[in-house]
Design a protein with these regions (language model features):
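Glycine-rich FAD pyrophosphate-binding loop
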Residues: 9-30
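Short hydrophobic segments within beta-strands
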Residues: 18, 85-86, 132
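Helical element adjacent to the flavin cofactor pocket in flavoenzyme catalytic cores
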Residues: 129-184
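Residues forming the Rossmann-fold NAD(P)(H) cofactor-binding site
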Residues: 2
Length: 184
């Protein structure tokens, strides 16, 4: 909701946001601030569809973090600028084949042993370490950046006061807001 509110406002629309629970209390907080490009979907065997659709998300979000995207979130805190993914020897050959596929080529790099974080060096862990372009932002910081300029456009509403009108195919055709002053 907040992202869309910012986009609409940036494009000149007079928009407001009704929230029935807590701002960011759904997907924003559930994501833990993880911005990924679909590798988790690709690892499960889905190299098309969802994985392809979100492959560019890290690049898109990085542009927004620089203030160059469709929403300026340059004041949002970045917690980690990349992911590391480890695979043990049993999983390694299958993973190497997978990582060499066209859909992931150039997006993932093998980390040299001398560049391993202390944990991996100290424990002499067998396997391979990969650097992914995915990263982590501070979700509460993002909520603050997105909501701050729109405080006068944010409204908390009870779920019992809102009703969606639908056509015969269940498409939303209208919204009814009920209040003590009447129905809008």
């Amino acid at each position: 909701g907040l992202w869309l509110l910012n986009r609409l406002h940036n494009e000149g629309y007079q928009a407001i946001l009704f929230e029935t629970e807590v701002l960011g209390g759904g997907q924003t907080i559930a994501s833990q601030g993880i911005i990924h490009g679909g590798l988790k979907y690709a690892l499960s065997g889905s190299l098309s569809g969802t994985a392809s659709t979100i492959a560019g998300m890290p690049t898109r979000w990085r542009a927004c973090l620089k203030g160059e995207g469709d929403v300026d979130i340059s004041r949002c805190a970045l917690l980690c600028d990349h992911y590391l993914m480890w695979s043990d020897a049993n999983f390694r050959s299958r993973l190497k084949t997978f990582l060499g596929s066209k859909s992931l080529r150039g997006r993932i790099a093998t980390v040299a042993t001398d560049e391993y974080p202390d944990f991996f060096r100290q424990h002499n862990i067998k396997g391979s370490l990969y650097r992914l372009p995915d990263f982590v932002i501070d979700a509460p910081s993002l909520l603050s950046v997105l909501s701050e300029p729109h405080q006068d456009r944010l409204f908390k509403i009870s779920p019992s006061l809102i009703a969606f009108e639908q056509d015969s195919q269940a498409n939303v055709t209208g919204v009814q807001l009920n209040s003590t002053r009447g129905t809008i």
